[in-house]
């Protein structure tokens, strides 16, 4: 056991039994790094992060790796939801040096906390090779790492001066955005698709044009009908691993859901529609159902259960075939878009096709929920984050106004 056993954070407690001598971020431990002249390994993640859990199991439980880290580094673990300020600093570093980032965010710092390297997920052998190289460089030629860090800081300062002097303006011109947006599947062009609620909010309030309206409709359609939405329990997953929005990365984050409730509600309010009321209602009901005893909304729901990533959400093809009748199976195939892109290893991930037969809907949904009820529900991180709860309160108010539901307000 290490000192993380005393952590309030569920994410940090997951690492309490690691053989690594993980420390909290504190003035005392940072002073120790300077006194002992040791590099710092800073590892940042959060409770719902699938790859954080994988690296914890594969890499941070490894005795050989732990011994090397304990002897040669100061090892610090951070929950990004507890220290968004620190996470922001080192996420900026990886974005500036590599162009992309994510979690787990694993950094190597000089004893004075200046970064010299940042990466994300590493298998055990790759991680050991990486930290061994940096240990050797720092031992034999520390000036090389110090110079690199100094150059990065100078570059960052110059970049900030440029940003302050530039007069960039947000443009509503479709032509200027066209190279960044996906006209085939909606959203921002990327191999992975994030809902990007702030971008959606920006689009909603743009002057109406046929091109923008068509793009917004396509984006909202795929966000509410494809794999990023959970049509049984309600709620949105964090992102999809493919550009077509078919298969999600299965954690649910409060801040995403809160903002998407606002986006969909405001879209309907502006357009004088009730197009997304069922999605909004189901999502609100889901988050209310898992609200903590102290009346706060939890920060996230894990991607994993005992069956692995998305284990709670996947439906085995043979199990569905036994539970549903032939007619129910035919209906489910249409209603939940059960086709080849959503089938992996004889397991379905269901979508939210708005094709609904009232007579069959309740029966089929109830049976599918029963299948889920026999699985362990993913871990809920009951950490109450004030700003995210405020986002949800805003979402409830927006929904209440848009759909004239006083219970939400």
Question: Across the structure, where does each feature detected by a protein language model lie?
Answer:
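Short, intrinsically disordered, charge-balanced linker/junction segments flanking boundaries
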Residues: 405-409
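Replace the tail clause
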Residues: 1-402
């Amino acid at each position: 056991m290490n000192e993380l056993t005393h952590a309030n954070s569920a994410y940090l407690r997951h690492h309490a039994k690691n053989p690594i001598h993980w420390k909290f971020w504190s003035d005392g431990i940072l002073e120790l790094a300077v006194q002992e002249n040791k590099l710092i390994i800073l590892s940042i993640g959060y409770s719902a992060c699938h790859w954080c859990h994988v690296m914890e199991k594969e890499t941070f439980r490894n005795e050989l790796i732990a011994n090397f880290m304990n002897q040669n580094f100061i090892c610090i673990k951070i929950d990004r939801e507890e220290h968004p300020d620190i996470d922001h600093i080192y996420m900026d570093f990886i974005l500036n040096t590599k162009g992309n980032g994510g979690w787990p965010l694993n950094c190597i710092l000089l004893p004075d906390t200046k970064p010299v390297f940042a990466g994300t997920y590493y298998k055990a052998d790759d991680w050991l090779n990486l930290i061994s190289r940096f240990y050797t460089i720092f031992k034999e030629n520390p000036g090389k790492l110090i110079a690199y860090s100094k150059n990065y800081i100078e570059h960052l300062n110059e970049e900030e001066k440029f940003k302050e002097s530039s007069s960039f303006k947000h443009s509503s011109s479709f032509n200027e955005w066209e190279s960044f947006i996906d006209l085939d599947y909606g959203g921002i062009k990327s191999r992975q698709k994030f809902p990007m609620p702030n971008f959606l909010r920006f689009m909603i309030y743009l002057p109406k044009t046929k091109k923008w309206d068509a793009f917004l409709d396509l984006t909202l359609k795929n966000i509410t009908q494809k794999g990023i939405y959970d049509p049984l329990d309600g709620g949105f997953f964090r992102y999809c691993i493919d550009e077509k929005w078919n298969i999600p990365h299965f954690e649910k984050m409060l801040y995403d859901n809160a903002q998407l409730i606002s986006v969909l509600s405001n879209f309907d309010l502006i357009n004088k529609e009730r197009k997304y009321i069922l999605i909004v209602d189901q999502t609100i009901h889901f988050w209310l159902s898992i609200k903590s005893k102290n009346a706060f909304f939890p920060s996230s729901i894990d991607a994993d259960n005992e069956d692995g990533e998305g284990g709670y959400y996947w439906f085995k093809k043979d199990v569905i075939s036994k539970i549903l009748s032939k007619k129910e199976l035919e209906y489910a195939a249409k209603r939940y878009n059960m086709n080849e892109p959503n089938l992996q290893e004889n397991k379905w991930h269901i979508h939210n096709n708005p094709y609904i037969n009232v007579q069959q809907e309740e029966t089929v949904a109830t049976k599918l929920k029963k299948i889920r009820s026999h699985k362990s529900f993913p871990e809920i991180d009951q950490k109450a984050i004030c700003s995210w709860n405020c986002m949800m309160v805003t979402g409830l108010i927006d929904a209440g106004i848009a759909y004239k539901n006083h219970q939400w307000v």
